[in-house]
Regions:
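C-terminal amphipathic alpha-helical interaction region
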Residues: 1-148
């Protein structure tokens, strides 16, 4: 059985650990989004837009609806991804203003983790559309079923 002081000490240690872990995860996710995912998405968007342009020249009467739909979906997703990346970056910067551990933990839970969930949702959606050779990370199938 813990004394009140021991219990409070454990509480503070666990709270501090939670804050550090979520902060590290958020910064890691932000770096992955900015340095790996967004450049890969832009590269794929460029490829699809060049494909659409080539089809217009080579086959002006051809149905380009599939390519144009992919281009539109990727472009819209990339825009939303870019915005939430900026929001996450801004929200991470605001963490330094939180000095009370419980206030910081609640901010991380209510703001940062929500930003991360939205960023993840958008990244997963774009991953579903992009061919594996464009995506910078292995997909779930590669991770689960690859033999090392």
């Amino acid at each position: 059985i813990f004394t009140k002081a021991e219990l409070h000490s454990r509480y503070e240690i666990l709270l501090e650990n939670y804050c550090k872990v979520v902060h590290i995860e958020a910064n890691t996710m932000l770096e992955m989004a900015k340095k790996d995912i967004m450049p890969a998405v832009m590269k794929y968007i460029k490829f699809v837009s060049e494909t659409v342009a080539s089809l217009k020249v080579a086959l002006p009467d051809a149905d380009r609806s599939a390519e144009e739909d992919i281009l539109k979906r990727m472009s819209n997703s990339a825009g939303a991804f870019y915005k939430i990346t900026g929001k996450l970056e801004s929200d991470i910067s605001a963490i330094k203003d939180k000095n009370v551990p419980l206030q910081k933990a609640c901010y991380l839970r209510d703001v940062i983790i929500q930003d991360m969930a939205e960023l993840r949702r958008l990244a997963d959606g774009m991953e579903e559309i992009m061919p594996p050779e464009y995506y910078p990370y292995p997909n779930y199938g590669d991770i689960l079923f690859s033999v090392i």
